[in-house]
Every structure is written in C-alpha cells, then in structure tokens.
Swiss-Prot record:
GO biological process: killing of cells of another organism
UniProt keyword annotations, A-Z: Cytolysis, Disulfide bond, Hemolysis, Hydrolase, Secreted, Signal
The protein's enzyme class: hydrolase
Protein name according to UniProt: Sphingomyelinase C
Annotated signal sequence range: 1-27
Lineage: Bacteria, Bacillati, Bacillota, Bacilli, Bacillales
Principal subcellular localisation of the protein: secreted
Annotated catalysed reactions: a sphingomyelin + H2O = phosphocholine + an N-acylsphing-4-enine + H(+)
Length: 333
C-alpha cells in the first residue's frame, strides 16, 4: 500500500502479451509435481511492536503458522517480518512445513548467510523484513542491501534475499525482495526512480552470479509497483519493471488486487478511502530457463477473528495481514 507505513513515527516499509514468452494464459499447469513449482509471496505486516504495539503481531504469527493457505508450497517469500520476536515466532511455527529457512534480511551479517553484499549496516535502525522458507534444501543464501532508499526507508536495511534451492534433481534460484515504498517523505526524490534503481541492482546481481541459463530464476515479493490501470501502458512503471528484469509477464488469476480496503479489515481501518492496488508478484527471468506457464493467483484467506485493545477500546479483525498472499504456479520444462 502506498505510504501505508506512515501511520506512525516511522515508515518501514506489470496483460502486456508482447512481453510474455510463455504459452497461452489458458494453458494447464503440468501435473508432474517434479515439473511444477509452487511459490508464494506474502507481506505479513509484522511491523515493530516498539512503534506499532497494537497490530496483533504475536497472535498473527500463530494464526499464519497454522493457516491452510500457506501450506503445500515449495517456497514462501515473507515480507515485512520486521518485528524480531513475532518474526522469530512465525519462522518457528513454519519450521515443520518448511524446515529450510533463511534469516531475516539485514538483521545481522553472521554465518547464517553465505555472503552479505551491498550497503548493509549494523547501525541501521531496522532490518529489511524479508525471509525465505523452503520445503527443499537451500544450497546457498545471500543477503543484499540496496544502495539507497528515500524517506523513512533509508532507516531500514531493505534489499533482497537470494536462495539457491535444490528440488529433487534440479536447482531453482529464488530472490525475495521488498522495494521502496511510495512515500511523500521522499521529498524531491521520486520513489519510482528509486525502485527502478533497486530493480537494476537485482538484475546486475543475477548477471554477475553467472547462473546457468538452463536453470530457473524467480523474483518475487512486494514490488510496490501497481498493476492496476497500467497493464496496457507500455510507458508505465509496471511495464518498466518487466523490461528492467527482462522477465515474463505471468497469467493473473484470483482477486484483482493484493491490497484492498474494500475487502480487507486491516487495510480498511488504516486507509478506508484508498483505491485498491496490485503490488505483489512472482515473475521469471527470461535470461534463464523459461517456464512453459507461470500463474500469479491472489488468494483472499480470512483468519479467525483476533482482537486488540488500544486506548481502552477493542478492535476486531479477520485477516492475516493487510496484504493478500500471491500463489505462483510455475510449470517447468
């Protein structure tokens, strides 16, 4: 959500058929599980409880960990796992289903990473809030912190997590990220220009990694790039995202937005009059193995009701997060 994290002191926080080189959007995904990869991305809205103590982070960590929607994936990318205690609890709750996990981006630069690259700083107030969990072994884990952000994003180690995952007899490379937020506090700096530079950093990393061109490379997360009303505009930021990453446009199914105040109780409380946005994606690099089909499906799972108290008033919600999860089905050749 544009500027959604500005409700307190700190903000931590593209069809274009010609760009899609896969088969028809109506193609059926392979029924061979070894040839199908299921990847989910979900921004779980776990802001620091030091700043936002009343968003049920600990309770939602348990609800998400037990939820059906997050099960039966190969890989899950988590965004906004900022709060240390709640994110540790969520990762612990997911351990049985997804025993192979990265640490949270930018929280430390220790031996939990094979490499730390980019502009990491241990003195930055907030981490990058991205982690990847996997059913399959993770052969390599790299964290990369972007060169710069704007506005309050400068106060976090935002960047991306790279994983090399071995599913049976093949390697798949999954990058999880959370790009610059749309933020009025960026001043004269355009958040869109910052996002473009961050996408270039991801693309440069992929090129320099020399990944074999017969292996799949997937990029996913909260891109903060809005698909709505942009799909048929070749000059839009949405179109530019795919061009910069040289990535295939997926088939889109499910709900028409990943953030929607008309259907989501948390989003409605925060920004009741804001238009819906489609910000979260999982896409495939065209410089590497090209999926025969890739679908992004927006799910709308409802959580059991949970209640918080603020200033002696109770507030009840029935969503896991203010963002909806996106489930990608990738048919590999």
């Amino acid at each position: 959500m544009k500027g959604k994290l500005l409700k307190g002191v700190l903000s931590l926080g593209v069809g274009l058929g010609a760009l899609y080189s896969g088969t028809s959007a109506q193609a059926e995904a392979s029924t061979n599980q070894n040839d199908t990869l299921k990847v989910m991305t979900h921004n779980v809205y776990m802001l620091s409880t030091n700043l936002y103590p009343n968003w049920g982070q600990t309770e939602r960590a348990d609800l998400i960990g037990a939820a059906d929607y997050i099960k039966n994936q190969d890989v899950v990318i988590l965004n906004e796992v900022f709060d240390n205690s709640a994110s540790d609890r969520l990762l612990g709750n997911l351990k049985k289903e997804y025993p192979n996990q990265t640490a949270v981006l930018g929280r430390s630069s220790g031996s939990e990473w094979d490499k730390t690259l980019g502009n990491y700083s241990s003195s930055t107030p907030e981490d990058g809030g991205v982690a990847i969990v996997s059913k399959w072994p993770i052969a390599e884990k790299i964290q990369y912190v972007f060169a710069k952000g704007c506005g309050p994003d400068n106060l976090s180690n935002k960047g991306f997590v790279y994983t090399k995952i071995k599913k049976n007899d093949r390697f798949v490379h999954v990058i999880g990220t959370h790009l610059q937020a749309e933020d009025s506090m960026c001043g004269k700096t355009s958040p869109a220009s910052v996002r473009t530079n961050q996408l270039k950093e991801i693309q440069d990393f992929i090129k320099n990694k020399n990944i074999p061109n017969n292996e799949y490379v997937l990029i996913g997360g909260d891109m903060n790039v809005n698909k709505i009303n942009a799909e048929n505009n070749n000059d839009s930021e949405y179109a530019s995202m795919f061009k910069t990453l040289n990535a295939s446009v997926p088939s889109y199914t499910g709900h028409t937005a990943t953030w929607d105040a008309t259907t989501n109780s948390i989003a409605k409380y925060n920004f009741p009059d804001s238009p819906a946005e489609y910000l979260d994606y999982i896409i495939a690099s065209k410089d590497h193995a090209n999926p025969s089909y890739i679908e992004n499906k927006v799910l709308q799972p409802k959580s059991p009701q949970w209640t918080v108290t603020s200033w002696f008033q109770k507030y009840t919600y029935n969503d896991y997060s203010d963002d909806y999860p996106v489930e990608a089905t990738i048919s590999m050749k």
